[in-house]
């Protein structure tokens, strides 16, 4: 049993040597050690961690926020906050519920707040790549943009040691997030909304032209000519990343989000939605140039994804650079001895990663993603809000699965954007992506009736099948939902690696939520309650 205390502070951080220092919100065990991103917490499988979260934030937020979207607003000032361990299985009272917020010194708290110390059982399967971040109602986009996010690893030595993966200095976290800055170094966030008569400040997506990695703008990382493990997290508010190396160096994907694949998959590029993690092996010994050389990690995803503005080759099209050491030559000093398999990827994998069959009695649900626009003209229409099944977070729960069961959700995207769907507690994976035929007619009917059967979904869900990428065929905590598609996902309300029930009461109050992880969408109001039943 381990006990830790972490707090949130306001601090100043240098994102680039040519920029003024930037005020940020940070996590840390003290102000002196706090950073953006926050400290990476390393836990052990099946060893509980007890964390007391403290709020030492100032009286006012450092970024603008919009009180016209559902928001935690304390009566006596202060910045509300609550921590969600994203991708973990924990009891509802430790999940970071949106209404479980609290202000500095616990002076005020939300309606579902009950305790200062959270219990993290650490029972989800390896590879254990998860992260923690703020989750206060209506403030996720502002508070994560301000800096309240960090990586969390659950190690499982008995499972992972035979894989002989790169470790220590050869195991790197890359926490990627886009930002926009004012000339004085402060983070820029719009103060005027897309439809100010409805929401004075809220914008449907935040995009910054500066790409930061581990708190630095366009950084450099020195690497040797050997294998590295890169745990890549897209911690951007809304930006998708389609990353590749400038010299074509491949990624060997071993895990996606918290779970290993059934076998490694080698790809030339990776598409990461916000909140998505890929765990990859990169072999820098494959770099052809024998001299010390730089290779760039590039991004080509348009924003919003998939049909928005192309990435700028000199700004958001660049992520970082890797400084690859010179190749060892006869007569040079002998390099550090490397393990014999340093350029070999083992055939690691876990047998429970892929869904192989769907039980015929599986409960089926239909989840519909809506975008409420100012008009029907695609050239002038502005987004006012977004909903799931036409409902708000405050509306009664309609997704009430039985704890320990598995369900099939058909997620129908009637918006022009790709949405990263995130479920708290549960793990899930896409098994089919089916294109809608004549989606405008179906959407028009759904906006009137909000009923998939009355609108003849079976006559529209007959288009092309898009294959689920091999690197995403495992149990995930974020699944990409493309526009004008029905994406079918298998959702497990149990521990997938051993088929056991949760070691806590997942049916307790205040329950869980599921939502789009484009933070601006989540805040207004693409989020719904998820209540498990006994």
Swiss-Prot record:
One of its GO terms (cellular component) is endoplasmic reticulum membrane. It comes from the Eukaryota. Cu cation 4 binds at residues 419, 516, 521, 526. It is found in: Endoplasmic reticulum membrane. It is a peripheral membrane protein. This is Multicopper oxidase LPR1 homolog 3. Its main location: endoplasmic reticulum. Expressed in roots and basal stems. Binds 4 Cu cations per monomer. The Cu cations are bound as 3 distinct Cu centers known as type 1 or blue, type 2 or normal, and type 3 or coupled binuclear. InterPro entries: Cu-oxidase-like_N, Cu-oxidase_2nd, Cu-oxidase_C, Cu_oxidase_Cu_BS, Cupredoxin, LPR1/LPR2. Glycans are attached at residues 109, 234, 291, 312, 323, 341, 372, 450. Cu cation 2 binds at residues 86, 133, 517. Its cofactor is Cu cation. Induction: Induced by phosphate or potassium deficiency. One of its GO terms (biological process) is cellular response to phosphate starvation. The keyword Oxidoreductase applies. Belongs to the multicopper oxidase family. It is an enzyme of class 1 (oxidoreductase). One of its GO terms (molecular function) is copper ion binding. Multicopper oxidase that may play a role in the maintenance of inorganic phosphate homeostasis.
């Amino acid at each position: 049993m381990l006990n830790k205390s972490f707090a949130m502070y306001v601090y100043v951080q240098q994102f680039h040597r040519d920029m003024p220092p930037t005020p940020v919100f940070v996590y840390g065990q003290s102000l002196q050690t706090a950073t953006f991103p926050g400290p990476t917490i390393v836990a052990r499988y099946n060893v509980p961690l007890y964390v007391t979260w403290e709020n030492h934030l100032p009286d006012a937020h450092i970024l603008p926020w919009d009180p016209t979207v559902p928001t935690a607003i304390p009566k006596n000032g202060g910045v509300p906050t609550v921590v969600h361990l994203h991708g973990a299985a924990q009891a509802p009272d430790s999940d970071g519920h949106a209404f479980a917020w609290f202000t500095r010194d616990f002076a005020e708290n939300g309606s579902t707040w009950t305790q200062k110390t959270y219990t993290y059982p650490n029972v989800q399967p390896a590879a254990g790549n998860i992260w923690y971040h703020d989750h206060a109602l209506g403030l996720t986009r502002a508070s994560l943009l301000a800096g309240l996010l960090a990586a969390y690893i659950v190690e499982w030595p008995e499972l992972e040691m035979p894989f002989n993966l790169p470790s220590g200095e050869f195991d790197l976290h890359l926490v990627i997030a886009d930002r926009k800055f004012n000339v004085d170094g402060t983070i820029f966030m719009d103060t005027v909304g897309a439809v100010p008569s409805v929401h004075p400040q809220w914008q449907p997506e935040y995009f910054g032209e500066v790409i930061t990695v581990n708190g630095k703008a366009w950084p450099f990382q020195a690497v040797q000519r050997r294998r590295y493990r890169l745990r890549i997290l897209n911690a951007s508010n809304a930006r998708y990343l389609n990353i590749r190396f400038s010299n074509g160096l491949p990624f060997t994907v071993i895990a996606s989000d918290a779970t290993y694949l059934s076998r490694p998959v080698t790809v030339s590029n990776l598409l990461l939605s916000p909140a998505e993690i890929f765990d990859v092996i990169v072999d820098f010994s494959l770099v052809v140039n024998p001299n010390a050389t730089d290779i760039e990690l590039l991004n080509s995803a348009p924003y919003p994804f998939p049909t928005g503005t192309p990435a700028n080759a000199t700004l958001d099209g660049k992520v970082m650079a890797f400084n690859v050491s010179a190749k060892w030559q006869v007569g040079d000093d002998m390099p550090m001895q490397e393990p014999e398999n340093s350029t070999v990827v083992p055939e690691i994998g876990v047998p429970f990663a892929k869904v192989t069959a769907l039980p015929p009695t599986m409960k089926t649900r239909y989840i519909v993603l809506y975008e409420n626009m100012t008009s029907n003209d695609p050239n002038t229409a502005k987004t006012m809000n977004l909903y799931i099944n036409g409902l708000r977070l405050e509306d009664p729960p309609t997704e009430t699965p039985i704890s320990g069961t598995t369900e099939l959700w058909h997620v129908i995207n009637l918006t022009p954007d790709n949405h990263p769907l995130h479920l708290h507690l549960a793990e899930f994976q896409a098994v089919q992506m089916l294109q809608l035929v004549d989606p405008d007619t179906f959407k028009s009917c759904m906006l009137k009736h909000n009923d998939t059967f009355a609108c003849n979904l079976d006559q529209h869900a007959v288009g092309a099948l898009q294959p689920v990428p091999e690197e995403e065929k495992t149990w995930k905590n974020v699944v990409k939902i493309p526009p004008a598609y029905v994406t079918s996902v298998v959702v497990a309300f149990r521990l997938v690696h051993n088929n056991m029930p949760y070691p806590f009461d997942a049916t307790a109050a205040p329950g869980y939520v599921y939502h789009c992880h484009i933070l601006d969408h989540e805040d207004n109001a693409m989020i719904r309650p998820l209540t498990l039943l006994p």
